[in-house]
A protein has these predicted regions:
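Flavin-dependent oxidoreductase catalytic cores
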Residues: 1-420, 424, 428-435, 439-440, ...
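Short, structured coil segments at secondary-structure junctions
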Residues: 322, 345-346, 479, 517, ...
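Rossmann-like dinucleotide/flavin-binding elements
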Residues: 411-445, 484-492, 496, 503-520, ...
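Rossmann-like dinucleotide-binding cores of NAD(P)H-dependent redox enzymes
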Residues: 439-479, 551-599, 655-658
Length: 676
């Protein structure tokens, strides 16, 4: 248990609203809404779960005031009002307040929409022709559909860079009116607040980097922020009963001092703008990172990319200049961090975004002192999903995204459960089984918990992943779970329980080529575990997640590295927000990348391989090296079930579903324990 967090739990008045605590869920694009942008069961369940967990203020991200093809919520017609009213009612039941973040995309929505509809119409005509046996018309209409679609994509790509400068004053006025109309609908639906999305189109107009206009909306600082202030005024006029918040995107600095983001204001201008916003009647300001770079990781950075609470210095400056509440967001991963920010008086409200996806009960646990499940900032299930237009989920929270259908069930009588293996899957199985009221014992053959997570935490920037293990070490004793280290479970141990969950993980494998038994060949797992120390030039066989991370680890320890990968690119499964960091590291250290290359032999001089060229030819490749590191995947471990008489379920890497995948480990363990 940790100390309760009294500052986080203090109420605060924001405009016309009384928030019961200082914990906020900031806007995130979830992908949970219906195809037309209205609120469906998945959205409703997700946001109500946050409210039930004690969050005081929830912002629905990227709500469009017009109908677009983008997978975001939309409040563009009166017909959508009832679904938003249902959302407001669900959140209000738990004492939370709810806001809509209104935004407009940075493109000509009607123009792109007409092109998309034209493409769909041509495709429909093609299918009708095909059904009638008219192959000539079918081919012509399909070609027409594809051509229009390609033109739509080209226009979209162009507009994302240039619409801010090409939009007419008339178009900007129409967009402003659409935003105001959406705010009026929100008020009618019982929504409590509107957050102006200060990034996207509005932020692009504010930006001295992106805004090259020469009219009243371009040039000087006053002109660049003019439209944003007009949007604020339009919202306040259309929905006078609502609290109005402004998300203030700021172009921060990377650790190397270079600018981070484009679609916002520099810190000095942001501070000046904050004063103008207060004068315009804004009730609250959320200081955030500017975006518009094409990489979501710039706005929502992965572990190790930016310091914790990295936007806080600007939030502190803004708070000193305005009298309205100021929220801070950005890698606030613990209750203690949020409490410290409030104690220091540098912000008034703490926005826990990814953290609340990971643990929606942060507010409740802040009151009791129960440890929270801290977000890893891995970005695998959430930010990558946003980038790829999929619905988001948290790798550590098997319920996330399916709150309507998944929850821990009450136990069925008194049961003893044996869990074999203290890796992440075994620990999650133990947690869920114990939450159901069962008597749980974890048997771990080694002297520590964590399994492969310990290896995953070794590469640069990845040490934060150990928070996943530390969480279980904190909570399992309080749940009554017994952990026996240095204990290889036996059939007798399992038979003493009513059921067993086996989570014995996987082992790494070696490609059986000539020379694979050489002393110069080592396992990537042994490298990451610190069992071997390599020097000189190293060839890493396998350019997947483990291979690339091992390569970075070796670079950090002074080695020269070459990577041999059979696929056409390395790090195929890595987070898209982390991949640029890896590639930058490789470029800085001149890492050789041999893709579409198959290992054939290991010799005293190095490795021999075959590379498939672009034209399909095969060419021999020789890479000189002092050591060869095998990082070619893993294979599920087997547990000897001879003599075991109780029901057994395998989870995690040994389940056969997918190895070296934390989301799979958590999911299989959760569901197995929930069905005992």
């Amino acid at each position: 248990m940790t100390a309760p967090a009294p500052k986080l739990l203090q109420p605060i008045t924001v405009g016309p609203l009384e928030l019961k605590n200082r914990i906020m869920f900031p806007p995130l694009t979830t992908g949970y809404e219906e195809r037309d942008g209205s609120i469906g069961e998945r959205s409703l369940a997700f946001y109500e779960r946050l409210a039930r967990g004690g969050v005081s203020y929830i912002v629905i991200g990227d709500v469009a005031p017009v109908m677009t093809a983008s997978p975001t919520p939309k409040l563009a017609t009166d017909a959508q009002i009832p679904t938003f009213k249902a959302l407001a009612d669900a959140v209000h039941k738990h004492g939370a307040k709810i806001a809509l973040q209104l935004f407009h995309p940075e493109y000509d929505v009607p123009g792109v929409g007409r092109m998309v509809m034209g493409s769909m119409a041509a495709a429909k005509a093609a299918q009708e022709a095909k059904a009638a046996g008219d192959e000539e018309t079918f081919a012509a209409k399909m070609a027409e559909s594809n051509e229009i679609r390609n033109q739509a994509y080209a226009k979209l790509h162009h507009d994302m860079q240039h619409f801010v400068n090409e939009a007419s004053v008339e178009q900007l006025t129409q967009i402003k009116e659409a935003i105001a109309a959406s705010a009026a609908r929100a008020q009618q639906a019982g929504i409590d607040a509107i957050e102006v999305h200060g990034d996207r189109l509005v932020g692009s107009l504010c930006s001295a980097i992106l805004n090259q206009r020469t009219d009243e909306y371009g040039g000087s600082f006053e002109n660049r922020v003019r439209y944003a202030l007009e949007v604020v005024a339009a919202i306040k006029e259309a929905a006078p009963q609502l609290m109005v918040e402004y998300k203030l995107p700021v172009i921060m600095e990377n650790p190397d001092g270079t600018p981070r983001g484009k679609g916002g204001l520099q810190p000095d201008e942001a501070c000046e703008f904050a004063k103008l916003l207060e004068g315009a009647g804004i009730d609250m300001i959320q200081v955030a990172q500017a975006n518009h770079t094409g990489n979501m990781g710039d706005t929502i950075p992965p572990m190790g990319a930016m310091p914790y609470n990295w936007t806080l210095p600007v939030a502190e400056r803004v708070k000193a200049l305005v009298s309205v509440p100021v929220a801070t967001v950005g890698r606030v991963v613990s209750v203690e961090a949020g409490e410290k920010i409030l104690e220091d008086g540098v912000a008034d409200i703490i926005a826990y975004g990814r953290s609340l996806m990971c643990d929606p009960d942060i507010a409740l646990k802040a009151a009791t002192g129960e440890p929270i499940r801290e977000c890893l900032n891995c970005n695998k299930g959430c930010v990558d999903a946003i980038q790829n237009r999929k619905y988001i989920s948290c790798v550590l929270n098997a319920e996330n995204g399916d709150e309507a259908t998944i929850a821990i069930k009450p136990g069925e009588g008194d049961k003893k459960i044996a869990v074999v293996g203290g890796g992440i899957a075994g620990l999650e199985a133990a947690r869920v089984a114990a939450k159901r009221g069962y008597d749980v014992t974890v048997y771990e053959a080694s002297d520590h918990l964590g399994g492969q997570i310990v290896l995953a935490a070794a590469p640069p920037r990845k040490d934060e992943i150990m928070r996943s293990v530390e969480y279980y070490e904190k909570i399992l004793p309080g749940l009554g779970v017994k952990v026996e280290l240095n204990h290889a479970a036996t059939a007798e141990d399992l038979n003493a329980a009513d059921a067993a969950i086996v989570a014995v993980g996987a082992h790494d494998v070696v490609i059986p080529v000539p020379g694979a038994d050489s002393d110069k060949v080592v396992s990537s797992w042994d490298v990451l575990a610190g069992k071997v120390e390599l020097t000189g030039r190293v060839a890493v066989i396998g350019g997947g997640l483990v291979g690339t991370e091992t390569a970075e680890y070796l670079l950090q320890h002074g080695c020269e590295v070459a990577i041999v990968e059979m696929l056409d690119k390395i790090a195929a499964g890595e987070s898209e927000t982390i991949l640029p960091l890896i590639m930058s590291d490789f470029a800085e250290h001149n890492v050789e990348q041999h893709v579409k290359t198959r290992l054939t032999a290991i010799t005293d001089e190095g490795v021999e391989a075959i590379c498939t060229t672009e034209d399909g030819a095969e060419e021999p490749v020789k890479i000189a090296c002092d050591y060869v590191v095998m990082a070619v995947g893993s294979k599920a471990n087997a547990f000897d079930l001879d003599g075991v008489t109780v029901p057994v379920t395998c989870v995690g890497d040994c389940s056969g579903e997918r190895t070296a995948d934390i989301a799979s480990a958590i999911r299989t363990a959760y569901h197995a324990a929930n069905e005992l």
